[in-house]
């Protein structure tokens, strides 16, 4: 459950990014990490907006991409669990959509990656 002292940023993407950074994770915006993966890190990506049923609400979708170095695949599951446990603190602002991609080896950064999906429900303006 979200802490009543939570410091809101200007956007929900910034909230997610800063929360993870303040938790001690190495966090990047998409396409900003340069070089090979040497230690676990996260990339926070905005995945677009979808309408919420027939209500005057929408869902902003976000991916939290979890990376571990090529030779540390065995640490991927624990890293994902830790990230999900941390993000549970942001409910109901962000809800896990129960979507988690299979692991993917990203040769461009020499890392294994799994994406976990989160949603932010909001009233249309």
Give the location of each predicted region.
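Beta-rich nucleic-acid/ligand-interaction surfaces
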Residues: 35-39, 106-109
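A short, hydrophobic beta-strand-centered structural micro-motif
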Residues: 38-47
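Short acidic low-complexity segments
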Residues: 28-36
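Charged, amphipathic alpha-helical segments and their flanking helix caps
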Residues: 1-28, 46-125
């Amino acid at each position: 459950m979200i802490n009543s002292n939570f410091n809101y940023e200007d956007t929900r993407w910034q909230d997610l990014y800063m929360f993870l950074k303040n938790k001690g994770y190495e966090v990047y915006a998409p396409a900003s990490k340069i070089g090979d993966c040497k230690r676990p890190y996260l990339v926070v990506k905005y995945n677009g907006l979808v309408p919420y049923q027939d209500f005057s609400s929408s869902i902003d979708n976000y991916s939290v991409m979890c990376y571990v170095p090529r030779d540390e695949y065995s640490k991927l599951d624990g890293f994902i669990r830790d990230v999900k446990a941390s993000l549970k603190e942001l409910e109901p602002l962000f809800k896990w959509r129960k979507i988690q991609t299979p692991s993917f080896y990203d040769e461009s950064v020499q890392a294994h990656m799994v994406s976990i999906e989160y949603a932010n429900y909001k009233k249309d303006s």
